[in-house]
């Protein structure tokens, strides 16, 4: 009897196991999943139903979900209020839940989809999970219930837009990407400068930029790319709608050459013009007025809860005055009701002058510059931004081109503050982590999409580690990496230029008269790719005639009347200098691109590779030669063949695109 009972129990357990659906594959992985039997097939036309009492709080979330379902699935959904029916998507706020906190949610898939959370933020995160499930499972959703919440409250990405301009559209797409992976902070580093050795060792010629419109200081704003106050405020509002806190950073008193260019008298004569002079009253008057311009008034420009004042890498000789300056501006920002943030620097600049700690958040970025244990003892809140593990500096040759995704996935946690200090799990004051992209090499040719190629996989793995926390890995890294490669960047975002299968854009011969274009089915193709075509230019081609054009780049023939093939993007120009395209005859051209460079093949043979060119300079500070590698890359434009104003004149055929 006992043996029979045991066998029956085992059979029941097996049947239960078979009946339960496996945990859906999403990034970050779910904290809990209780599978049920069967699947739910959502219709292509359906309803998002909001609990009537939550209509005001959840209508924007529902509207965003409608847009995303259209982008991701091609579905048409409408928004209603009331009681949900079969196959509906139901959104509702629930009672406070200590485990779910401010960002957690419950998602149930039975005869309908129900997303409930104590906060609007939690409901929104639930919609991101649903979208990822739909991407993998299409209309057939595995039934079950998840309770999901983040292990760390602050999960972020910092982008240096001071040394390299990024368009407003790019920043908006980054918000969508971060949100899709439940990363909730986007720090925008608004001012910085290059290294003088690359600009004839002349501070007056050294590149520097401040990216915000300023009415108090006309002429301060960078001329090669900036954001109006209205644009930046709207960007922050968009971030709030997507659950992403935009953290503006105005970096002072170092990295401040843009301000010294505008007002030379506040630049330091002793330590370099990128350092503000901490002993001049004019310096404080300027910084007071600059910060006040964005923090004051009934409708301030900076509308979020946090404002970053930089404070990193000032000369060590001025520790006491630096500490006074830092203390002053932490309190100054706090006086406007904001939470001030700073880069850690008090270990490198120790002294007797007290620096405000209460209510201050510190990016713990360097073992040499910040002591996390002492910082927490003093009352600072910390965000792990360890340079050793979490810095990307494209094309520099120091720090990283790509984060070590496998090591981060398998080993890293936000408790690992630097290469020598790991805090005990659960240490109060550690808020989470943030990785950073620094564009130190001003003018090195790097593109927005080059940066995204590096940052996107980092977003995926950092999202996983900071949401999931110290909980056991869901799958081995190889499986996680494979999952990452199948995931979209976000609904409606394709900065990587993914195209899927090989595509023929133009099979039959086309003749273009220089004033017309052909729109194709693709926008662009990203790394690594091969684009091939046969081309026969007219005897008198247009000068710099557009051959291919896309949202971010353009390819030309007869560049500057030289007969060469060239391309432009991000304000840079690149030409294949070793080949002149013959007119009046057919030539087979192939262009291959990857994240390191771009190759031109002519009639099946490699003609030229754009990679490895360097700008070489002398650095008198260290008495050594230095070099800056130039990034000659191209995400190939495909949206239009030809141009309606100044296009290619001639014949074209056999346009094929392959992405590896």
Feature annotation, model-predicted:
Residues 499-660:
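Extracellular glycan-associated modules
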Residues 259-361, 365-379:
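Active-site neighborhood of glycoside hydrolase catalytic domains
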Residues 48, 69, 119, 157, ...:
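Conserved, mostly hydrophobic/aromatic
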Residues 155-159, 186-188, 246-250, 307-309, ...:
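Hydrophobic faces of well-ordered beta-strands that scaffold small-molecule active sites
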Residues 1-24:
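Bacterial Sec-dependent N-terminal signal peptides
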Residues 98-274, 282, 291-306, 439-441:
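Feature activates predominantly on carbohydrate-active enzymes
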Residues 355-360, 367-509:
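Flexible, acidic glycine-rich loops studded with aromatic residues
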Residues 19-150, 340-349, 356, 493:
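Acidic, contiguous N-terminal accessory segments
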């Amino acid at each position: 009897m006992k043996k029979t009972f045991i066998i029956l129990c085992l059979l029941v357990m097996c049947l239960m196991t078979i009946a339960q659906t496996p945990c859906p594959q999403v990034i970050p992985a779910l904290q809990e999943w209780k599978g049920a039997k069967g699947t739910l097939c959502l219709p292509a036309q359906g309803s998002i139903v909001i609990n009537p009492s939550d209509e005001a709080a959840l209508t924007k979330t529902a509207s965003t979900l409608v847009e995303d379902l259209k982008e991701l699935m091609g579905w048409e959904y409408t928004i209603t209020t009331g009681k949900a029916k079969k196959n509906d998507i139901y959104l509702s706020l629930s009672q406070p839940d200590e485990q779910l906190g401010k960002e957690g949610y419950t998602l149930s898939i039975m005869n309908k989809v129900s997303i409930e959370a104590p906060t609007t933020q939690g409901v929104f995160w639930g919609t991101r999970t649903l979208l990822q499930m739909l991407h993998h499972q299409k209309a057939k959703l595995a039934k079950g219930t998840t309770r999901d919440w983040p292990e760390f409250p602050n999960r972020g990405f910092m982008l240096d837009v001071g040394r390299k301009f990024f368009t407003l559209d790019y920043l908006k797409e980054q918000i969508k990407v971060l949100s899709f992976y439940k990363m909730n902070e986007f720090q925008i580093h608004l001012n910085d400068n290059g290294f003088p050795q690359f600009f004839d060792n002349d501070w007056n010629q050294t590149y520097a930029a401040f990216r915000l419109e300023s009415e108090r200081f006309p002429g301060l704003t960078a001329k090669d790319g900036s954001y109006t106050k209205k644009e930046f405020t709207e960007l922050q509002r968009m971030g709030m709608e997507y659950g992403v806190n935009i953290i503006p950073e105005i970096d002072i008193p170092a990295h401040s050459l843009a301000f010294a260019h505008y007002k030379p008298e506040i630049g330091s004569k002793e330590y370099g013009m990128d350092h503000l002079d901490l002993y001049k009253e004019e310096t404080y008057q300027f910084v007071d007025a600059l910060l006040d311009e964005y923090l004051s008034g009934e409708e301030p420009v900076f509308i979020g809860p946090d404002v970053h004042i930089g404070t990193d890498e000032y000369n060590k000789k001025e520790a006491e005055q630096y500490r006074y300056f830092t203390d002053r501006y932490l309190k100054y920002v706090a006086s406007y009701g904001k939470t001030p943030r700073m880069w850690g620097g008090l270990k490198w600049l120790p002294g007797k002058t007290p620096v405000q700690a209460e209510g201050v958040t510190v990016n713990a970025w360097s073992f040499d510059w910040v002591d996390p244990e002492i910082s927490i003892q003093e009352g600072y809140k910390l965000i792990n931004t360890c340079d050793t593990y979490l810095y990307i500096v494209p094309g520099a040759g120091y720090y990283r081109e790509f984060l070590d995704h496998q090591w981060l996935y398998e080993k890293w946690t936000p408790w690992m503050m630097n290469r020598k200090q790991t805090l005990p799990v659960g240490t109060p004051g550690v808020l989470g982590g943030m990785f950073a992209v620094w564009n130190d090499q001003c003018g090195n040719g790097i593109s927005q999409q080059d940066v995204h190629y590096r940052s996107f996989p980092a977003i995926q793995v950092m999202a996983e580690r900071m949401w999931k926390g110290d909980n056991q890995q869901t799958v081995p890294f190889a499986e996680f990496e494979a999952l990452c490669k199948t995931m979209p960047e976000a609904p409606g975002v394709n900065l990587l230029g993914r195209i899927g299968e090989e595509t023929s854009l133009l099979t039959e011969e086309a003749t273009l008269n220089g004033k017309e274009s052909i729109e194709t089915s693709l926008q662009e193709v990203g790394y690594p790719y091969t684009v091939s075509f046969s081309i026969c230019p007219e005897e008198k081609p247009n000068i710099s005639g557009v051959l291919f054009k896309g949202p971010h780049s353009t390819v030309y023939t007869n560049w500057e009347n030289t007969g060469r093939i060239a391309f432009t993007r991000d304000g840079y120009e690149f030409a294949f200098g070793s080949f002149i395209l013959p007119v009046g005859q057919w030539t087979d051209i192939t262009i291959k691109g990857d994240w390191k460079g771009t190759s031109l093949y002519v009639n099946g043979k490699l003609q030229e590779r754009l990679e490895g060119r360097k700008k070489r300079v002398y650095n008198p500070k260290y008495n050594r030669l230095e070099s800056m590698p130039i990034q000659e890359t191209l995400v190939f434009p495909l949206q239009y063949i030809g141009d309606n104003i100044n296009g290619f004149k001639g014949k074209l055929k056999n346009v094929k695109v392959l992405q590896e």
